[in-house]
Curated annotation (Swiss-Prot):
It is an enzyme of class 3 (hydrolase). This is Elongation factor 1-alpha. The gene is tuf. It comes from the Archaea. It catalyses: GTP + H2O = GDP + phosphate + H(+).
C-alpha cells in the first residue's frame, strides 16, 4: 500500500455543482467502491426522489447529509490511480461550511475545482479558489461538470472556461498551466477515458490529469511540529496527545516541548493505526506518550516540537489577510477568533498597516482607517492568550489561519513575521 506516493486531494467548488457525485464517480471508476454498493445507493436514492445523488451518497454517509443532500463534515476517502494513491478531502460547499473548507484544504496537496457548466462561476467558486490559494494549494485541475445538462455544448464549455480562467488569473494561478476538462460525473464522461459525447475535446481525461500532478516534497527537513488535536489519559500509559505531524520527524527517545505551556519530556512511544512505530513523519496521524507530561500540561491547540527548537509563541504577529465577508467595516480593536492549525484563539487587530490590491498584491493605501469585504491587507495582530504560530516563510503548515466571527469566516490569511513572547 505504501509503495505508491500519497497525495491529499481537495474537491472544491460551489454548492450543488456536483462535487460529491464527482468524487463518488471517481471512487467507483477506480474500483474503490464496489458496484453493488452503488446499486444499493441508487435504489435508496430513487426511493427518496433523489436518483441523481447515488454517487454522492458514497461521500455523504452521514444521515443528516443524506436528508439535506449537503456535505457537512469533511469525508476522507481513498482511491488509487496507477501512479498515486489519493485521499480525497471532499470539501463542503454550503456557505456555513467554509471553516471546514479551510481546515480541509490546508491538508491538501492539490485540488479539483468543480464548476457546473450550466451555472458557470458562482460566489462560492470564487471564495474556494481564493481560499485554496491563500491556504497554499498550488496545483489545480478544473472540471467543467454537468456537461450532460449543457447538452455537451463546446460553446458553453469555452464560455465557462474563459470565466474560470479570468478568476484564476485574479488570484495568481497561471490559467495556462491548469488543465480544464469537460466532465459529467453523473454520466461518467472524461473521468477515466475520453468521451464520445465531447468529440471536440482532445485533452486528457481526469485520471490522466491526476497522474500528472507532482508530489510535494515532504517537509521532513524542517523542525518537528505537531499541533495537538486532543490529549487522552490512558490507564497504565499516562497522557497520550494525538495529532498530525506537519513538519519534521519525531523519534522515540527524543526530548520534546509543548508550547505555549512549556512542558518538556522524552518521547516514550509513538503509535499509529494501533501499531507501535520508532518514528513518525509528516502526514502521519499519531498518538504519542511523553515521560513526565501530565494531563494538565497538554491541550488542544498546543504544538509539540524539539526541546532545542521549540515552536514560536507569538506576543504579536504580522499577517497578510483577505477579507471574505463582513457586514460593515473592520477597524483597529476588532477581536474575532483566529483558527490556526488546531488552535482557536481570540486575537485583537492592533494596526492596519497597508491595504493591498487583492489581484496584484500591490499597496493601495498606507495605514487605512478600515478594511471591508473584498480587501486584502497587512495587519498587526495580538493574541489575547498565548498562541503558537510560525511565519509561512519558515513553516508554512503553521502559518495559515482563518478568522471567524458571527458564525462565519470573515477572512483568511497567513503569518508574515512573529514577535516572540519573552
Amino acid at each position: 500500500m505504501a509503495d505508491k506516493p500519497h497525495m491529499n486531494l481537495a474537491v472544491i467548488g460551489h454548492v450543488d455543482h456536483g462535487k460529491s457525485t464527482f468524487v463518488g464517480r471517481l471512487m467507483f471508476e477506480t474500483g474503490a467502491v464496489p458496484a453493488h454498493l452503488i446499486e444499493k445507493y441508487k435504489a435508496e436514492a430513487k426511493e427518496k426522489g433523489k436518483e441523481s445523488f447515488a454517487f454522492a451518497w458514497v461521500m455523504d454517509t452521514l444521515k443528516e447529509e443524506r436528508e439535506r443532500g449537503v456535505t457537512i463534515d469533511i469525508s476522507h476517502k481513498r482511491f488509487d490511480t496507477d501512479k498515486y494513491y489519493f485521499t480525497v478531502v471532499d470539501c463542503p460547499g454550503h456557505r456555513d461550511f467554509v471553516k471546514n473548507m479551510i481546515t480541509g484544504a490546508s491538508q491538501a496537496d492539490a485540488a479539483v475545482l468543480v464548476v457546473a457548466a450550466p451555472d458557470g462561476v458562482m460566489a462560492q467558486t470564487k471564495e474556494h479558489v481564493f481560499l485554496s490559494r491563500t491556504l497554499g494549494i498550488n496545483q489545480l485541475i478544473v472540471a467543467i461538470n454537468k456537461m450532460d445538462a449543457a447538452k455537451y455544448s463546446e460553446d458553453r464549455y469555452n464560455e465557462v472556461k474563459k470565466e474560470v480562467s479570468q478568476l484564476l488569473g485574479m488570484v495568481g494561478f497561471k490559467a495556462d498551466d491548469v488543465p480544464f476538462i469537460p466532465t459529467s460525473a453523473f454520466e461518467g464522461d472524461n473521468i477515466t477515458k475520453s468521451s464520445a459525447n465531447t468529440p471536440w475535446y482532445t485533452g486528457p481525461a481526469l485520471l490522466e490529469c491526476l497522474n500528472n500532478l507532482t508530489v510535494p516534497s515532504k517537509p521532513d527537513t524542517l523542525p518537528l511540529r505537531i499541533p495537538v488535536q486532543d490529549a487522552y489519559t490512558i490507564s497504565g500509559i499516562g497522557t497520550v496527545p494525538v495529532g498530525r505531524v506537519e513538519t519534521g520527524i519525531m523519534k522515540k527517545g527524543q526530548k520534546v516541548t509543548f508550547m505555549p505551556s512549556g512542558a518538556t519530556g522524552e518521547v516514550k512511544s509513538i503509535e499509529m493505526h494501533h501499531e507501535e512505530w520508532d518514528q513518525a513523519v509528516p502526514g502521519d496521524n499519531i498518538g504519542w506518550n511523553v515521560r513526565g507530561i501530565g494531563k494538565n500540561d497538554v491541550r488542544r491547540g498546543d504544538v509539540c516540537g524539539p526541546a532545542d527548537k521549540p515552536p514560536s509563541v507569538a506576543d504579536e504577529f504580522t499577517g497578510q489577510i483577505v477579507v471574505l465577508q463582513h457586514p460593515s467595516a473592520i477597524t483597529v480593536g476588532y477581536t474575532p477568533v483566529f483558527h490556526c492549525h488546531t488552535a482557536q484563539t481570540a486575537c485583537t487587530l492592533m494596526a492596519i498597516n497597508k491595504k493591498l490590491d487583492p489581484k496584484s498584491g500591490q499597496v493601495k493605501e498606507e495605514n487605512p482607517t478600515y478594511i471591508k469585504a473584498g480587501d486584502a491587507a497587512i495587519v498587526t495582530i495580538k493574541p489575547t492568550r498565548p498562541m503558537c504560530i510560525e511565519p509561512v516563510s519558515e513553516i508554512p503548515q503553521l502559518g495559515r489561519f482563518a478568522i471567524r466571527d458571527m458564525g462565519m469566516t470573515i477572512a483568511a490569511g497567513m503569518c508574515m513575521s512573529v514577535t516572540q513572547k519573552k
